[in-house]
Amino acid sequence: MSEISKNEALILKYLASKNQEIEESNIEIKGLSRQDIASATSWLQVKGLIDVKTREEVAYVLTDEGKRYAENGLPELRAYSILKRKGKLSLRDLQEAMPDEYKIVLAQLAKFGITPKNGVLEYSDGHIEAEISRRQRFLSDLNTDDQEMIEHFKRRKNVIEEKKRSVRIVSINSKGLEQLNNFDQFEAIGEIDSGIITSQAWKTAPFRKYDLDAPVSPTKSYAKHPLVYFINEIRRIFLDMGFTEMSGHYIESALWDMDALFIPQDHPARDMQDTFYVKDSNFTIEHPEIEKRIKRIHERGFDGYSGWGYRWSSDDGKKLILRTHTTVTTARYLYEHNTYPQAIFSVEKVFRHESVDWKHLAEFYQIEGAVYDKNVSVATLKWILRTFYGKLGFEKIRLVPSYYPYTEPSLDVVVEVDGKEMELGGSGIFRPEVGKILGLKAPVMAWGMGLERLAMLYYGLTDVRDLYNTDFSFLEGYKIKY
C-alpha cells in the first residue's frame, strides 16, 4: 500500500466527507493553499487513490475594444441615443461625432432597417432600443447561455475572445477509502524544519518513509547550445589530429578575400547579389605590400602561368566586404607563417547574400582546414579527407572532381547518409598562382564545409533554421553522439 503525506490524507478525508464528485478548484481545506491542494491531488491521482475526470469548458472574455464598449457603451447604442434625442442625424454630423466608429455604427444600424436617405439617418423605434440594450447587458455579464449574443459578437470580431480551460473533477475511490482507513500517520514527519528540532518532536514522532519508486516530474536539463557543443567537437577533432587553430576578421578587404586567392575581379562571386559590401573609409588593410604582387600575377602571371590578362584595379581591391569564406584567414596566416610544415584550422562565421530557406543561411559557420607541406599531393588530400570525415562518423565518402577558382585540382566531398548521397564540402590544392602571391615554398591542400549543414545531419534536422530557433523542446532534448 502506498504511503501518503499529511496533505494527501487531508484531501482524502475531505473527499470522503463529500462522497461525490467535486471540482478540484472548489476544494477548501484550512491551512492548504491552492498549490498545496493541486500538488496533493496530482499525487493521489498518480497513486490511484482518487478518480479524476477532465471537463473542457469554454468561457468568453472582453478584448480591449470590448472593455471600452462595456464602459462607454456600444457604438450603435451611443449613436441611437443621439438619433432618438434629435430625430434626425446627418452622416457628416455622425462622422464628426464618432470618427473612429462611423462605419461600425452604419453597419449595425442598417441591421435594424435604419439606413441613410439623402445623407440623413432618421429615428425609428420598433423595439430597436431594447435589442441594442440587450447587447450592452451581455457585455456586462457575458452570459455563456446566451448563444445568440455570443454568435453576434463573434461575427463582429475583436469584441469578445473565446477562452478554453480544463476543469478537473475529482472523487475518492475504494482504494482511497481503504488507504484513509489505514492512515495513522497524521503526525508523521515528512520534512525536517527548525520547529521539529527545537521541540525535539523527532525523538518520538514517526518519520514518513521515502518512496524511491515514486514518480517525479522530469527535470529540465540546461546544457550548451547544440551548435556550441558541435563546434567544440570539431575543434577537438582538429586538435587531436595535431592542427593549430587560427582566427580572422568579419570585415575583410576584397584584396585579401578575393584577389590574394587569384579570384578575378570580374568573377560573379563579387557581384552585389552574392556579397555583402561595407561602407567604411577608416579601415586599415593588413600587409598592403602584397598589392604589387597581386597586380603583377593577375595581369601577367609568372613563369609558365599567364595570369588573367586584364587591368587589375587597386580601388576594387580596397573595397570592404563581409568575408565570404574563411580561406582568406588561411591565406593571411600562411603569408605571415610561411615556413612549412603547417596544419591549421578555423571554425568561424562567413556571410553570403543568400535567400534564406531550409538549407541556406545568409550568416553561417564555415569549417576550414589546411595543410602546408612539401609532401602535399592529391593522395595525401584524399587520405586526410577520409580521416577527418571518418572522425565525424561518415564512413562512406566519395571524392568527386569539381572546380573552385583558387584550387586545382578540386574535389567535392560526397557522403552517404541513410542510403542517400549528400555533398558536404569542397577541397583542393592551392593553385600555383595563389602560392606565388602568398610567397609559399610548398603546396597547400585545403578543405571546408558549412557547419550548419553538417549539424543538420548530426542532430537529425530537416531545416537548418531550426538550429537558431527558440524551440526549447529541441534545445532541452537534443542528443549527443559519442
Curated annotation (Swiss-Prot):
Assembly behavior: Tetramer of two alpha and two beta subunits.
CDD domains in the record: PheRS_alpha_core
NCBIfam families in UniProt: pheS, PRK04172.1
Cellular compartment(s): Cytoplasm
Residues involved in L-phenylalanine binding: 327, 366-368, 406, 430
Cofactor info, note text: Binds 2 magnesium ions per tetramer.
Alphabetical list of Pfam families matching this protein: tRNA-synt_2d
Family: Belongs to the class-II aminoacyl-tRNA synthetase family. Phe-tRNA synthetase alpha subunit type 2 subfamily.
Binding of Mg(2+), residues: 408
Protein's name according to its UniProt entry: Phenylalanine--tRNA ligase alpha subunit
Isomerase is among the record's keywords: no
CC annotations in GO: cytoplasm
Cofactor(s) it depends on: Mg(2+)
Disulfide bonds, paired cysteine numbers: none
Keywords in alphabetical order: Aminoacyl-tRNA synthetase, ATP-binding, Cytoplasm, Ligase, Magnesium, Metal-binding, Nucleotide-binding, Protein biosynthesis
Chief place where the protein resides: cytoplasm
Molecular-function GO terms, alphabetical: ATP binding; magnesium ion binding; phenylalanine-tRNA ligase activity; tRNA binding
GO biological process, one term: phenylalanyl-tRNA aminoacylation
HAMAP family per the UniProt record, alphabetical: Phe_tRNA_synth_alpha2
Enzyme Commission designation: 6.1.1.20
Catalytic activity: tRNA(Phe) + L-phenylalanine + ATP = L-phenylalanyl-tRNA(Phe) + AMP + diphosphate + H(+)
